[in-house]
Curated annotation (Swiss-Prot):
Residues 64-67 are annotated as: G3. Residues 17-24 are annotated as: G1. The lineage of its organism: Bacteria, Pseudomonadati, Spirochaetota, Spirochaetia, Spirochaetales. GO terms for molecular function: GTP binding; GTPase activity; ribosomal small subunit binding; small ribosomal subunit rRNA binding. Residues 9-196 form the Era-type G domain. It comes from Treponema pallidum (strain Nichols). It is a peripheral membrane protein. Belongs to the TRAFAC class TrmE-Era-EngA-EngB-Septin-like GTPase superfamily. Era GTPase family. Monomer. This is GTPase Era. Residues 175-177 are annotated as: G5. The gene is era. The keyword Cell membrane applies. Gene3D superfamilies: 3.30.300.20, P-loop containing nucleotide triphosphate hydrolases.
Amino acid sequence: MVTDGASPRSGVSLIIGRPSSGKSTFLNAVCGYKVSIVSPIPQTTRNTVRGIVNIESDQIVFMDTPGYHRSDRKFNLRLQSLVHSNVKDADVLLYLVDATRQFGEEEAAICALLAPYQKTRVLLAFNKVDVLHNSTSCDEHAFLHRQGSVLRAGSLGRALHAALPHLPADRVFTISALHQVGLDALMRTLRDLLPEAAPLYPQDCYTDQTIAFRVTELIREQAIARCRDELPHALYAGVEDMELRRGKRELWCRAFLAVERESQKAVLVGKKGAVIRAIRLDAIRALRTLLPYHISLDIRVKVDRSWRQRDHTLSSLLY
């Protein structure tokens, strides 16, 4: 733990976990700002999203990775490759485990990926412990201690210990990212694992995302929320043109949503344009909370068949 006069620590912490383990919720919670889109639909994070946390003289650059999912489809293989490439370079590997689910093939694959680093730079956090017990109104420390004991003794905890037998016990935590319970202890240990180094980014910075990326992601988030049952993974978003107007007080943006079939386009547009109009208004409201501009946004819907099989499209979307 950093004390007065200690050298600053700075580094990159990669957040890894199976789809819907709460990685984006955790990132937004520790950053204090919306950095990554959140959806109940698995694998909505497609890029390595960076969120920056400054605590005293320390700086943690979090990287929220796509949910790790074993699949032979080209799209999912590219997501897996993205995670693998980032694991090697990170200073700390934060493994978020959904405490409500059993150990399965995806957890086994993640443990195999992290096993070479378990002694030195892996942290494990059982997330969603609030779901296991509906109330956290009792003393927080007692609640987390009790839940941690139950999880470690259960089948999930035993399987994780067997897969990562050399992970130190003091680097295993129980948290609720949604309710921000147990995060302080986790963050203290994470800071201790960072190398002594100067900050990588200015102290007032909380993400390195471009405005175009944030616009694209928020549009996609609203589209997924409106059409979650029909086409969550069949769409992508993009910005065609963007500029600051009216003395840099207005952000004008022409964007698009692309789907794979005409029938999906009809769902996204809706009767008399009702769905795409609602997506546009929701995106504008979300952008106004994040950006210091008046937002002028136009969204069109187009069909882009087989985009998930084209290398150049995947390269532009997954990075």
